[in-house]
């Protein structure tokens, strides 16, 4: 069976609108859950995990309230001793959802049978697009402009591991920014230079995007 810990952040402007118990229940049914237990309904809920490529726990959600001095905790623990036996590879992309044609960084780490990270050589392959090793040892996946669900696989010493990167061809909308502010118009001094960045959103999710995925143009004699 599978155990799911499901956390939804509370109402927080620009980040989350929260969810009712009915909405959470419907979502858990969509995930195939059969038995459900509500552990907390407060804005201070924290979900911390130790990913397979680390030995330190990190909070992965964004609580809508501050922490509490007295709390209840549920821990899932495992042995902290390395077995030294390679079990699989943990593959992680800097973005799971990217704008088609963009490049995204991918890393991989060996994981032993006790889920402790270990050094192990590997090769990376992708089911679509292209992948290349960078000078810093990381890999860069360039997604196809046509869009695709891309499986990136690390393999070595008889072990494997994979992750899926979703390259979205048709985003719901594009944004143009000057710094942190979204732009609909811009007034500048003649002869000046303004740094602009573009972004893409799909299904309310910001897509990881690089400049190569955008085509820039201006209208009128403005530069």
Question: Positions of the model-derived regions?
Answer:
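Gly/Ser/Thr/Pro-rich low-complexity, intrinsically disordered segments
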Residues: 1-215, 219, 223
């Amino acid at each position: 069976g599978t155990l799911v810990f499901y956390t939804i952040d509370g109402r927080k402007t620009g980040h989350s609108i929260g969810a009712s118990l009915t909405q959470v229940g419907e979502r858990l049914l969509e995930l195939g859950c059969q038995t459900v237990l509500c552990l907390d309904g407060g804005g201070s809920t924290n979900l911390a995990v130790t990913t397979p490529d680390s030995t330190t726990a990190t909070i992965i959600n964004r609580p809508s309230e501050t922490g509490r001095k007295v709390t209840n905790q549920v821990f899932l623990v495992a042995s902290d001793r390395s077995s030294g036996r390679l079990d699989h590879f943990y593959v992680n992309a800097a973005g799971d959802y990217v704008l088609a044609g963009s490049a995204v960084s991918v890393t991989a780490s060996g994981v032993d049978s006790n889920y402790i990270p270990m050094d192990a050589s590997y090769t990376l392959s992708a089911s679509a697009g292209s992948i290349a090793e960078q000078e810093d040892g990381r890999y860069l996946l360039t997604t196809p402009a046509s869009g695709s669900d891309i499986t990136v696989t690390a393999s070595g010493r008889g072990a494997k591991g994979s992750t899926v990167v979703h390259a979205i061809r048709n985003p719901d909308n594009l944004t143009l920014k000057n710094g942190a502010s979204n732009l609909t118009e811009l007034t500048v001094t003649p002869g000046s230079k303004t740094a602009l960045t573009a972004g893409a959103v799909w299904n309310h999710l910001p897509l990881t995007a690089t400049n190569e995925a955008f085509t820039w143009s201006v209208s009128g004699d403005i530069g």
